[in-house]
Amino acid sequence: MSCVAFSFSAFAQTKTINSGWQYSENKTNWETINIPHTWNDKDAFDDAPGYRRGLGYYQKQIFVASDEKENIHYLKFNAVNQEATVFVNGHNVGNHKGGYTAFNFEITKYLNFNDFNHIEVIVDNSHNENIPPLDADFTFYGGIYRDVELISVPKQHLSLTDFASDGYYVNYYNVSEEQAGVEVKLLVDNFDSFKSQNHLYLKILDAEGQLILEEHKGFKLNAATSKDITITFPEIENPKLWSPNNPYLYKLEISLTDKKGNILDSKSSNLGFRWATVDAEKGFFLNGKPIKLVGVNRHQDYESYGNAVPLSLQKKDIELIKEMGSNVIRFAHYPHARELYKKCDELGILVWTEIPIVNKVTNTEAFVNVSKQMQKEHIKQYYNFPSVVMIGYMNEIFLRLAFDKKESDEEKEHRKQFTYNLAKQLEDLTRREAPNHITVMALHFNELYNETKIADLPMLVGWNLYFGWYHDTIEDLGVFLDDQHQRYPKRSLLISEYGPGADVRISATEPSRYDYSQDYQLLLHSGYYSQVMERDFVTGMTAWNFADFGSEFRGETIPHVNQKGIMQYNRAPKEVYYWYQSVLKTKEPFVHIANYQNELNLLEKNTHEVVIFSNQNEGKLYVNDVLYKDINFELGIAKIEVPLKQGVNTVKVETANTTDETDFNVELFQNLKTNPKSVLAINVGTHISFRDDILGVTFLKDRPYSDNLYGYLPNSGKCTKKLIPFNISNTINEAVYQTVLVDCNAYKVDIPNGKYKVTLYFVEPQLKNKTKVLFNLKEANDDSKADVMHRIFDIKLNAKTTSSQFNMAKMYDDKYGIMQTSEVNIAKNEGLTIQLNPIKGETVLSGILIEKLD
């Protein structure tokens, strides 16, 4: 094991001890790791259902010098998911439940001075009925994934034992444009066996570092006790107010000294003078002025890292969110790293922060106690950030109850009442512990929240709404909002989640619900934005989600990932990110040409709808260096049908103040006989095109057959298109396999004479998937009860049998991506005809790949 030596001075010091830990799953085989760390960064993304939820063991040696004997020592963990038991030199120093808030233990009496000390942490991310979250649409990565700190303080210091807070709380009073007051409540500990005389010195500095106000208070501390001290500053005249457009920050500096003036402890934090209110008719007000909240939700994980993400990348997230034009962020569904809240202070982003009581509760006293503990830790640790305006405690808490078929009606009524009672306790706790903040709760689309009256508890209700994705149409959002406002006119509301999944590899000329195209993502986001902006009573909207994130059970076009982000999992922007910039960024001119797929495949035409985003009113569009058209922007968008040629085409947009240019590499598909392709791929059973980045080929959308092109033949069966929203084993190209053409027995491709390699893509849609589907869709039913052994058919290419008695269920016990490859010689201008002759049941086909060999 690695060893680190420390020697502290006489005043408080904090050392980060992230490097050189040892980790093991079984206490036998150890590996050296650094914090942050998770053991689920890989297994939560493989083809095997589930991921390891259990015990993980960490250990480290630290050296503490002999001159540290007079100090008090704490071991602080900023987050461990989800339960941690800590040992120092074999002594159990404490246990903490909950994976998203900090905790610390005073370890002085367990230390050996002038010697090495053995630190051991047992981490458990097993499902625990008494620790929220019980169930959620995100992965519960196990591990020590935020900083570990060794804190050494003199015997008199700002308390570290008040729910692992900083030991002081900043309150504001009489804040207006004319004046603003600051009151600081501090908790000071004395670990000595005798009384002490101490002093507190507090300063307020402006953003330039100039002293504005200072206060001093002398006091006595009794032996082995703590003391609450309140220091009130006089009001500051004409303060500079904090807002998203002008995030002006003052600074509070705190020094604790002994009677001789020697500094024992010191802390500092941002001060931001602002006040926020909500009005059920007029929306959100900041500093007395109306402001429409528009921003995003954020999950903390990142591609390849799980939740063990370097702080530099996390801070970059906040910068990207601000650059998008956001004025609000919802840290979902748990407290995030404190450094990010500080970043929100600095950049001017209002914060909704919450604890992870998600989907359901357990009807036990232990669950209630852990929930209350979480909220107290949450409030006290994040209290001093001026960006924190909204504090929440539940998300979609009746989601499981609404779909639970096992509980009796009586049991459901009891659970409803228990949930309401817990919510009421947490609401009261939050209002008491966090005055001058707005309490919030997020609900899903269900009348249960109104029936139980749980929606009347918070000051602001957030609705997680997916009209046009899971159900109904985009336009139905406004109908719902108007209905809620009419029925509950005194209730303030915000759209706390919305958005469809989107895969940058997928495009659609006729986008529709649940097709995962970026085209549909733009339609939904812009449609929601329009409807929210038309309604003053809607406080605002936070898109779900800032970036794609891990959700192990999901089996979408990218398995184990929720793809509703406006950025990809690696933080590469999707096109809708740029659209938000066009409507939210007003200070600097902006224009962007959407390039959904650089490789364009145009079927039966030589034009393409180019989409342009800008915050300008008008511009000029150039195609291949020739002025094509003057354009106007509406809601930040211009859509122009543009003629393109085979090969590279340059498209440029100029506005009065800015310009953008991009290239489209165009492949025309107008006649496969006279303009043959070396590679032709077809995404059978769907209207979407899919780009296979590894093969470097686009699977074209499916279509009925027409001369000189391709498609399924008329009178060849029902030719029903089916969606399979599950992970497909043995492939990374789920988007090809997840759409199936059912009962379609003949498919023709008009390719010229020659030798070809033909690969057909199949999957058995009726096999029971091994992964539990938690968020089901109306049209995404699992046909696992069907007699799949009766799907048997022969495969023929130009009347030649390439596979007899083809039976996928007999070959595989899961939804497995199958490729059947054959070589075929085409002569006499006959083209290629694929025949699927049913023996039992209906035929299926998912994709076709044709490669010319000569």
Q: Model-predicted segments: where are they?
A:
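Extended acidic/polar, glycine-enriched regions
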Residues: 112, 185-279, 647
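A short tyrosine-centered beta-strand micro-motif
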Residues: 117, 250-254, 649-651, 754-766
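Compositionally biased, intrinsically disordered or flexible polar/acidic segments
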Residues: 670-854
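Surface beta-strand/loop "capping" patches
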Residues: 155-191, 581-616, 671-678
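Extended substrate-binding grooves/exosites of carbohydrate-active enzymes
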Residues: 35-44, 126, 131, 137, ...
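Accessory beta-strand-rich segments of carbohydrate-active enzymes
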Residues: 13-15, 24, 53-161, 165-167, ...
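Extended carbohydrate-recognition surfaces in non-catalytic/accessory domains of CAZymes
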Residues: 12-76, 129, 135, 141-144, ...
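Accessory carbohydrate-binding/adhesion or oligomerization-edge regions at the termini
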Residues: 12-46, 118, 122, 128, ...
